[in-house]
Swiss-Prot record:
Binds 2 divalent metal cations per subunit. Magnesium or manganese. It comes from Actinobacillus pleuropneumoniae serotype 3 (strain JL03). In the N-terminal section; belongs to the DHBP synthase family. In the C-terminal section; belongs to the GTP cyclohydrolase II family. This is Riboflavin biosynthesis protein RibBA. D-ribulose 5-phosphate binds at R30, E31, D35, R142, N143, G144, H145, T146, E166. The gene is ribBA. Mg(2+) 1 binds at E31. One of its GO terms (cellular component) is cytosol. The lineage of its organism: Bacteria, Pseudomonadati, Pseudomonadota, Gammaproteobacteria, Pasteurellales.
Length: 401
């Protein structure tokens, strides 16, 4: 269906809030399957029967870690060998059920799981409902239907649990595109992707919090250092602020990814240290601005992997080829945390100090107003000239050499 458009995440959340079933698909390079999803509070016999009739897959009950602990739902196996590490617990039935398999009795079990008064002794195992424990952090940590189900229930203001069921085609194989799209249209069912849900959360969830503010005298001048911590990962970042950023005027700003070798060791294999110095100097001269120092070593692959990439570069690969050879994308960085840091600092619009078009696009996607790009001008040396040319040719970096 070439003219098909996925639903808005807001519409999917509202449908979940109203007790409806929606369709959610994951990535093509993962399961590439669609699941029916609804909230556990609306695990009615009708919804379960619909999933069993049209989905024909295993009806599971994704739950938060808190619910699993409260009800003492233990992992199904000691060693999880599932291809995607789906976190099955022991299967359960509520003690008020008979066989537990009918749509009506599975409804009882699912709804009792989210009952405020539920306790571990209310359930027996094995049973006919299959709880799955969602990762803390949801789809931003694991892009599975388990996490999507719990995230959607939470975003809808409901208990952090739901139902999900894989969808099989009439021939018994898993239904994929475009048949999933056709089904959604025929049943007037909201249909979103997990990627959409990830993007929605990055834009709307509060994913970073400010911890402290302290004076930071530097060789460039005096700045204020604002410390931040990511809510999900605990990763720490710093904003170096000069002057008042909250007056509504556009702010000279830079996102600088941590580079221990360039920033601290003075390595000439990259231009990171020079870019940091140039940005600090320019902001000091202007008397107002901010540098976000993000812990994204090696374009997001980490220090050790960056050094491993250097080894491959010494054997003839370029910086992009080396990252890919190690199993990474050419650039693993994302900028939604940086965008939220800008927002918490009161920054409304920026003149972005960068040569990297991906930073511009990444911040714009988060709704940040970038009024201009200010180039970072550094002189290449014999050790980094080839590296910079590769970034220019393969990654679109905007250099003037």
């Amino acid at each position: 269906m070439t003219d098909f458009q996925f639903s808005k995440v807001e519409d999917a959340i509202e449908a979940i809030r109203q007790g409806k079933i929606i369709l959610v698909t994951d990535d093509e390079d993962r399961e590439n399957e669609g699941d029916f999803i609804c909230a556990a509070e609306f695990a009615t016999p009708e919804n379960i029967n619909f999933m069993a009739t049209y989905g024909k897959g295993l009806i599971c009950t994704p739950i938060s870690t808190e619910i699993a602990k409260k009800l003492n739902f233990h992992p199904m196996v000691a060693v999880n060998q599932d291809n995607h590490e789906t976190a099955f617990t022991v299967s359960v039935d509520h003690i008020d059920t008979g066989t537990g398999i009918s749509a009506f009795e599975r409804s009882i079990t699912a709804m009792k799981i989210v009952d405020d008064n539920a306790k571990a002794t209310d359930f027996r195992c094995p049973g006919h409902m299959f709880p799955l424990i969602a990762k803390d952090g949801g789809v931003l940590v694991r892009n599975g239907h388990t996490e999507a189900t719990v995230d959607l229930a939470r975003l809808a203001g409901l208990k952090h649990a739901g139902l999900c069921c894989e969808i099989m085609a009439d021939d018994g194989t898993m239904m994929t595109m475009p048949d999933l799209q056709k089904f959604a249209v025929e049943h007037n069912m909201p249909f979103i992707t997990i990627q959409q849900l990830q993007e929605y959360r990055r834009k709307h969830d509060s994913l970073v919090k400010q911890i402290s503010v302290v004076k930071m005298p530097t060789k460039y001048g005096e700045f204020m250092a604002h410390s931040f911590v990511e809510v999900i990962s605990g990763k720490e970042h710093v904003a170096l602020v000069k002057g008042d950023l909250t007056d509504g005027e556009q702010v000279l700003a830079r996102i600088h990814s941590e580079c221990l070798t360039g920033d601290a060791f003075g390595s000439q294999r990259c231009d990171c240290g020079q870019q940091f110095a140039a940005a600090m100097t320019q902001i000091e001269q202007e008397g107002r601005g901010v540098i976000l120092y993000l812990r994204q070593e090696g374009r997001g692959i980490g220090l050790i992997n960056k050094l491993r990439a250097y080894e491959l570069q010494d054997k003839g690969m370029d910086t992009v080829e080396a990252n890919v050879a190690l199993g990474f994308k050419e650039d693993e960085r994302e900028y939604y945390i940086g965008a939220q840091m800008f927002q918490q600092l009161g920054v409304k619009s920026i003149r972005l100090l960068t040569n990297n078009p991906a930073k511009i696009e990444g911040l714009k996607e988060q709704g940040l107003n970038i009024v201009a790009r200010e180039p970072i001008i550094v002189e290449p040396n014999k050790n980094d000239i080839d590296y910079l040319k590769v970034k220019q040719i393969k990654m679109g970096h905007m250099f003037n050499f």
